[in-house]
Amino acid sequence: MARRRFVVCYDIASPARWRQVYRIMQGHGEWIQLSVFLCDLDDVERIRLESLLAEVIHHRDDSVCFADLGQVERDAVKVVFMGKSRRLPNPGPAIF
């Protein structure tokens, strides 16, 4: 199953829910900036992550965005940092 790279960003109205979302995201990707993670996920991992987040967020007040950057193996997927850079996820298999 092909792994795809996603930028996942979120806007959570409650600080308590924000912390819950942050903890969930820590298990699925690399923290890039406040409320922004870079995640390499296959379809099963993405659906699982979406399900976990759906249980925590308030759908009327909060927002989570998954931006699909394409297959991890593609050379065309580039992430460029200005200023302090962050470590990108390892494109290999993830073991949880």
Question: Where are the regions that the model predicts?
Answer:
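C-terminal structural segments of small proteins and small subunits
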Residues: 57-96
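Extended, hydrophobic alpha-helical segments
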Residues: 1-45
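Short, intrinsically disordered low-complexity segments
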Residues: 36-63, 69-70
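Intrinsically disordered, low-complexity boundary segments flanking structured domains
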Residues: 23-24, 50-55, 80-82
